Amino acid sequence: MTHTAPQPADQPVFKNAAYTQEYINIAESLDGDIPGRRAARAYMDSSTAIVHHRVVSTSFVPKLYDTASRQVMREVVETTHRILCKVMQHYLDDAEYRKIFDYDPRLAELILVPRGYDALLPFARFDIFLDENTGDVAFCEFNGDGSSGMNENREITHSVEETATFKEFARRHHVEGLSLIHI
């Protein structure tokens, strides 16, 4: 599934690149914000963002999304969730439809076990690529079985939000965290 955002001629679709450049310019105006970088690194070194027994590496420059890019991602993810729920419900309701999936019989039996809650897909992670020049979106993968990256994202965000660079950027713009639980 690909989604293309409407765009006026000769206009960038999103402000993300401009936000990133502004953030870098702020850091440069603060002589690189060396104290902020050191504090961010120290935070990460004592954080829970650990993969394969190592603290994750990160950039001092966070990924900055404007409202338009968040809206595109929200629409794509919510539409995809609705489609997947319809497919899942049809699978549960129609024995003939289940045949096209060719699941191992043990798995098919487990899928049909009553859930005990209303949501068909209570948790999902949709990994997408957003082309910030065109607004096109492409999927990398769908996950309904894990929360990979959520802790790391939270810790990386916390590592920079007390820096002088981040505070100055946030003074100029409305900034809020990008929740991996719900966009």
What are these regions (language model features)?
Residues 1-181:
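Preference for protein termini
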